[in-house]
Amino acid sequence: MQKNYVIGFPRIGEKRELKKVLEKYWAKQTDFNEVKYVAEQLKKRHWNYQKEAKIEFISSNDFSYYDNMLDTSILLGAIPKRFESLKDEELYFTMARGNETCVAMEMTKWFNTNYHYIVPEISKDTKFTLNSKKVIEEYKEALELGIKTKIN
């Protein structure tokens, strides 16, 4: 018996909903609760699309507000010292975009394609600590819809 799965699902939304709400957030025209709401709606919609298409192994932890490599840095606690005083979405987006006092992490092309990613900053002083909050929350979100996911 064959089984099927999707490695990951596009996150931006058919009408670029994620991009639009993030731009409003960065312009201080909305708060992060609106961003989270849009993200939750997109994840639900995308998981249900896959369920309706009879995908047997649906992924969770494939959604990102900005960048999967940045998500991995957060997951592993690989936070550069200049960001240590920040937390939650302020930490996340400052690592990606910088702010008045912190320079953003480097962004570079993925294998010479037009896709860019945030380059992790790892040194001998990096203290790795697991932060599985996002992974567990997304798994539980899908479970509430009756979808038991494989975790990316």
Predicted regions and their residues:
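Domain-level signal for soluble alpha/beta catalytic cores
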Residues: 1-152
